[in-house]
A protein has these predicted regions:
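Catalytic cores of TIM-barrel enzymes
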Residues: 1-291
C-alpha cells in the first residue's frame, strides 16, 4: 500500500496511527476521488470531527511558528555572543526513516531476509525528497551545514553485506546530492562505525565532516587520513567521570593524531552530555587552546 501510493498511505494510514488528533484522516476518501473541483473539498470536510481536526492543525501550525521563531532568536543571540551555529537543517537517512517510522527495527531486520526488494523500494522513495527538502531548509535558514543523524547502520545493527546492499547506497546518494548542491553535510554516525570506514572514504575529499560516536582512532587515521574532518573523540564517559588531567591528555592525543593532517574538531563523542563535569568541559577547551 505504501509503495503503491506513499502520499495516501502517509496521510490516511500512518499519521492517524501516530496521533488521535488526525484520526479523521483515516475515514476520509482519497482526495483524487473527491473530484477535480476544489470546491468539493467543502462537503468532504464538513463533518464535525473534520472541523475539529482542522482546528487542531491550525493550533499545530501556530505552535510551530512560535517554536521556529524562538529557535531563530536563540541562534541570533548566540551568534551575537560569538558562538557560531554548527548546523541548522537535520534529518535521518532513508533507511532510518523506514526503520524508525514505517517498519520498526524488528520489521526491517526481517524485511532484509524476507522482503528485500520491497524494503529497497521503500528506502528508494525517500532519497530524492530528502535531498530536495534539505536544500530548501538550508536555503530558508541561510545555513549550508546540514546534520545527518545516522544510527541504524552501525556495526552492531547489521552485517557488512546488509550495510552494503540496504544502507550505504541511499545514504551515499543523499550525501552526494547535498555536496553537489554546494552544501556541507555533517554525518553524525552513532554506534561503532569502525567497520564502515572504507565506505566513508568513498566520499568527496574535504566535503563531509564526520562526527563519530565510537570509532577506533588509529583505524580512522589510517583509512580516512586527510580525506574528511574528524569530529568528536572525547568520550561522554570521560567528560562525566574523568578528571581534568585525563581530559587534557586525551585531547592532546587527539591533536597529535589528527592535527598534523588538518581537519579536526575536538568535541564530545555525542556532544557535551548533561552529566559532564564543568571542570572537564573547561579542561577540554583549555587543552585545545594550549596545545
Amino acid at each position: 500500500q505504501f509503495l503503491a501510493n506513499p502520499n495516501d498511505f502517509t496521510m490516511r494510514v500512518l499519521w492517524p496511527r501516530m496521533t488521535t488528533g488526525l484520526q479523521p484522516l483515516a475515514d476520509m476518501q482519497p482526495f483524487y476521488s473527491i473530484g477535480p473541483d476544489p470546491i468539493l473539498l467543502g462537503p468532504a470536510l464538513a463533518y464535525e470531527e473534520h472541523v475539529r481536526m482542522l482546528e487542531t492543525l491550525k493550533q499545530l501550525a501556530e505552535a510551530s511558528q512560535a517554536s521556529m521563531q524562538a529557535e531563530a532568536d536563540y541562534v541570533d543571540t548566540m551568534q551575537e555572543l560569538g558562538y557560531p551555529v554548527s548546523y541548522g537543517a537535520n534529518f535521518t537517512p532513508p533507511f532510518d526513516v523506514v526503520a524508525d517510522f514505517l517498519r520498526g527495527l524488528r520489521g526491517v531486520m526481517l524485511d532484509m531476509f524476507r522482503e528485500p526488494d520491497k524494503l529497497l523500494a521503500a528506502v528508494e522513495l525517500y532519497v530524492e525528497p530528502q535531498i530536495q527538502a534539505a536544500i530548501a531548509w538550508a536555503e530558508a535558514i541561510d545555513n549550508p551545514r546540514i546534520c545527518i543523524w545516522i544510527h541504524r547502520g552501525a556495526a552492531g545493527m547489521m552485517s557488512e553485506q546488509h550495510y552494503k546492499r540496504f544502507y550505504w547506497p541511499s545514504l551515499r546518494r543523499v550525501v552526494l546530492g547535498l555536496v553537489e548542491a554546494g552544501l556541507t553535510p555533517i554525518m553524525h554516525v552513532q554506534g561503532d562505525y569502525t567497520p564502515r570506514l572504507p565506505y566513508l572514504a568513498e566520499l568527496p575529499r574535504g566535503k563531509v565532516p564526520i562526527h563519530y560516536d565510537r570509532v577506533d582512532r588509529e583505524q580512522a587515521l589510517e583509512i580516512m587520513g586527510d580525506r574528511q574532518c574528524f569530529w568528536g573523540g572525547v568520550s561522554s564517559a570521560l567528560l562525566s567521570t574523568g578528571t581534568p588531567e585525563q581530559v587534557k591528555e586525551d585531547v592532546k592525543e587527539l591533536i597529535d593524531m589528527f592535527g598534523p593532517k588538518g581537519g579536526l574538531i575536538v568535541d564530545g563523542t555525542v556532544g557535551i552530555p548533561d552529566e559532564a563535569k564543568p571542570e572537564n568541559v573547561q579542561a577540554m577547551v583549555e587543552a585545545v587552546r594550549e596545545y
